[in-house]
Regions:
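N-terminal secretory signal peptides that target proteins for export/translocation
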Residues: 1-3
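Sec-exported extracytoplasmic/periplasmic mature domains
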Residues: 35, 55-59, 87, 106-109, ...
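Short alpha-beta junction capping motif
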Residues: 81-125
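An acidic, glycine-rich "communication" segment
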Residues: 26-29, 34, 38, 43-46, ...
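Short C-terminal domain-edge/linker segments immediately following a structured domain
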Residues: 60-66, 112-117, 143-146
Length: 165
């Protein structure tokens, strides 16, 4: 005997059709963290290129508009992913900004940091390491091991490519 539930769900799905999101915030936006000193936007087209690759390789729709956000902005928590770039030394964020970023990351937010100088030991690299140390003083910054799931979640990645190999 077929239950009413088993009949109702397929009929509902057929009537409704494919689920689509209609809100403006349904497309993935990646805001770039804006900071006071240093060059917080050395490559203005970088986010658009990243979002283009996300659209090309996944079913995620993106909003490629340029968006910069300060850590003090109340909408920070609306974005699951934020981007920080630079090539120069910058001053570590204020105590309240560090607290907001720490909370953002602790609650599941993702921060991608792009060292546009491409040099380990550059002024930007040193500033980032100081910032991470201030954010999470008990957790050392370590290289991701080759057996980490990030290297096999969507693609099998045999080697890291790009500027840093």
């Amino acid at each position: 005997m077929v239950s009413l539930f088993k009949l109702t769900i397929p009929l509902l799905l057929f009537k409704i059709g494919i689920a689509t999101a209609y809100a403006d915030y349904s497309n993935l936006s990646i805001p770039q963290i804006k900071y006071k000193d240093g060059d917080s936007n050395p490559h203005p087209t970088a986010i658009g290129s990243l979002l283009g690759q996300i659209e090309r390789r996944t079913s995620i729709e993106t909003d490629r508009g340029s968006l910069q956000i300060e850590l003090s902005h109340p909408n920070l928590y609306q974005y699951p992913f934020v981007y920080m770039a630079g090539s120069e030394e910058f001053e570590i964020f204020s105590g309240s900004e560090l607290e907001r970023l720490r909370n953002y990351l602790s609650y599941g937010g993702f921060l991608l940091i792009d060292n546009n100088s491409s040099n380990i030991g550059s002024k930007f690299d040193i500033s980032v390491r100081k910032m991470i140390g201030a954010l999470f003083p008990q957790i050392p910054l370590n290289k991701i091991s080759r057996d980490h799931s990030i290297f096999r979640s969507f693609y099998l990645i045999d080697r890291v490519s790009g500027r840093m190999q």
